[in-house]
Amino acid sequence: MKKLLTLSIIAFCLAACGSNNTENKKTTASEPPSPESANPSYDPKRGEGKFSKVEVSPTLETAKADAGEKVYSVKCSSCHKLSEEKLVGPGWKGVTSRHTAEWIMNFSTNTDEMLNKDPKAQAMLEICLVRMPNQNLSDDEARN
């Protein structure tokens, strides 16, 4: 249970305004090109940022879970719930099944670039209508 809580906290720190919106949208000539076509090196599974490989332990790391819970309480809980319920941003339940650890870490620490380039982040922004503010998370805070 603590592992799930920890992963959920990490995921929601990174995926602040996320949604599992699978609605297909047609591209028109007036829309900007997708990040993949504009930047062939862009990896939508990884996102935009410095994290390219994040190792996730198969067992719960209690110290990280406790630290992550503190970060969530101070910087995330005013906008995000640990359930599916949307507050200002989306609920965090299931975020690790929708996004990779790398994507979550990059979103948490590089929010503006992700919102500018990532189609999933842009779709979340359309639903939430509020850009997630930069929380100035350290790498360790984002990882916990």
What kind of feature is each model-predicted range?
Residues C17-N21:
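Bacterial signal peptide processing site
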Residues K25, A29-V71:
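Electrostatic cytochrome c docking/interface patches
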Residues K64, Y72-K75, S83, R131, ...:
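Short pre-active-site segment immediately N-terminal to redox-active cysteine/selenocysteine motifs
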Residues A65, H80-N110:
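Gly/Gly-Pro-rich "capping" loops immediately C-terminal to redox-active cysteine motifs
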Residues G89-P90, L125-M132:
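Surface-exposed aromatic
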